[in-house]
Amino acid sequence: MYNVLDYLKESARKYPDKVAFADIDQSITYEELYRKAQEIGSALASKISIGQPVPIFMEKSVDTICLFFGVVYAGGFYVLLDMKQPQTRLNHIMKTLDSKMIVTSQKYIEALKKKQMESDVILLEDLYGHVNLKKLDSIASQ
């Protein structure tokens, strides 16, 4: 295996129904994680450049793990922002990352609004849909 995506793909093939991750509210199998990560990666691939940071404003959860893998599929790297950080610290991180967008879930949109972040918001829920294997393979080959 060469990277974390190869590991995920192989785990989904070998153990499709085995629980990959769980939190207090939900669990996800390897096959479900693989599919959701590819859906997220396919959607994000048209929104980010390869090597671009993708700030994530969410608590750690199964959804966050899906998003982490999806960002890697899209060719970016994820930066999990601590939701408890003060606004000035978060703005400094965003400036350092030179990112104009932030990904969150509908569940955290009000908390994000309170931080008054000057970024385009992408909702995790909007990233689910179809998988573009051609696009993902193209990114993986770079």
Segment roles from a protein language model:
Residues 1-142:
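Carrier-protein-dependent adenylate-forming modules in NRPS/ANL systems
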